[in-house]
């Protein structure tokens, strides 16, 4: 309902014929740059998973999985579609759930860690041209960075605490607990048999995931994953910069009239709207509203902001959904090499275990 109201209001600010004309007359060289930089971002994101997984899955399958992840990530609210990555690497490529969850959590938090300093740099670059509230945005970016660094540091202990809590909740164990949360859980009666079994499996998965997070730190992945995450973010926003230029060329805009730091801030606001629970199917309505709000504050006329929001969203969705659907169909095809992939995974895991023991 909220999305429908937003769509109605935003579409009332423009003529549909203008939107069609913008899409038809899109600047093809800039559109090609969008595709190329998006491809570079795909490789970088896949490489990050490859590093986090210690090479358990080859780059090409990870690129396919990432395309599927891109298909679902904006389709559902609060980016829960990104969990499709966990399903794909476990169900289709035989990766253990704990390794999949550890790589998923670490990639997510490193994404947030990477965007915070980039936001601060963009705010510094625009300087006095930013409207009132720039200091608040800088403070939020710094807070985001600090929070994410704390989350990285406490991820392993937090997962173990959650595992302990669920284990106690499942068994109703009355032994002394290590925290008020587990102590409160221990005073309760055991959960029903079915629920207890489910909670027990979840507790074991979380404990194993914590072990995998610790193993990642021991492998020294923090710096390379952070650097790759910076590249991922720069590719994403660089691609959108080219896409925005492509749709605004028919309206008289040039590279010199589109400041990259300004575009970065505007796109960042629209992207953050996808994490909200009110995010609609494919984000239509909420995305354009956040885009329009951000870019009008940064100096674009309302009509141009609305037009560019719809045009960039439509083109990017066609690009992501088209490639993601093809990748999904390819992955879901019956493949005779699935058992081999699982054997390769088990072999790689045992080799990694032996190497850590050397």
Predicted regions located by residue number:
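Alpha-helical transmembrane segments of integral membrane proteins
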Residues: 1, 29-33, 60-65, 136-140, ...
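Transmembrane helix-loop-helix hairpins in multi-pass inner-membrane proteins
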Residues: 1-21, 69-194, 284-358
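Helix-loop-helix hairpins and the membrane-proximal interhelical loops
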Residues: 6-57, 217-261
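Hydrophobic faces of transmembrane alpha-helices in multi-pass small-molecule transporters and flippases
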Residues: 31-35, 67-75, 101, 105, ...
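Alpha-helical transmembrane segments of multi-pass membrane proteins
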Residues: 37-42, 69-74, 232, 267-275, ...
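Short helix-coil transition sites and intra-membrane helix breaks within transmembrane domains
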Residues: 38-47, 52-54, 73-83, 274-287
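Membrane-interfacial helix-loop connectors
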Residues: 57, 244-311
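Membrane-water interface at loop-to-transmembrane-helix junctions
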Residues: 184-230
């Amino acid at each position: 309902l909220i999305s429908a109201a937003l769509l109605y209001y935003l579409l009332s600010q423009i003529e549909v014929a203008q939107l069609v004309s913008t899409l038809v007359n899109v600047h093809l060289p800039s559109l090609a740059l969008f595709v190329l930089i998006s491809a570079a971002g795909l490789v970088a994101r896949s490489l990050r998973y490859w590093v986090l997984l210690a090479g358990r899955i080859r780059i090409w399958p990870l690129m396919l999985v990432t395309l599927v992840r891109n298909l679902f990530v904006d389709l559902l609210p609060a980016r829960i579609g990104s969990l499709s990555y966990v399903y794909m690497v476990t169900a289709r490529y035989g990766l253990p759930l704990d390794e999949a969850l550890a790589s998923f959590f670490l990639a997510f938090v490193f994404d947030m860690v990477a965007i915070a300093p980039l936001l601060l740099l963009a705010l510094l670059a625009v300087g006095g041209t930013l409207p009132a509230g720039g200091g608040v945005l800088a403070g939020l970016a710094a807070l985001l960075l600090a929070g994410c660094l704390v989350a990285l540091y406490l991820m392993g202990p937090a997962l173990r605490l959650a595992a302990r809590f669920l284990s106690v909740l499942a068994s109703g164990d009355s032994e002394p607990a290590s925290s008020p949360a587990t102590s409160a859980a221990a005073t309760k009666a055991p959960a029903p048999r079915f629920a207890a079994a489910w909670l027990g499996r979840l507790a074991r998965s979380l404990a194993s995931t914590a072990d995998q997070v610790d193993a990642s730190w021991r492998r020294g992945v923090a710096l390379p994953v952070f650097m790759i995450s910076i590249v991922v973010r720069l590719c994403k926003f660089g691609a959108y910069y080219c896409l925005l230029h492509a749709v605004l060329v028919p309206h008289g805009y040039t590279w010199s009239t589109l400041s990259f730091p300004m575009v970065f801030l505007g796109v960042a606001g629209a992207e953050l709207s996808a994490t909200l629970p009110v995010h609609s199917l494919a984000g239509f309505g909420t995305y354009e509203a956040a885009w329009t709000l951000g870019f009008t504050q940064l100096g674009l006329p309302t009509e141009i902001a609305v037009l560019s929001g719809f045009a960039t969203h439509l083109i990017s969705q066609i690009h992501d959904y088209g490639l993601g659907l093809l990748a999904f169909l390819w992955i879901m095809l019956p493949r005779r090499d699935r058992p081999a992939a699982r054997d390769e995974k088990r072999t790689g895991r045992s080799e990694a275990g032996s190497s850590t023991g050397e």
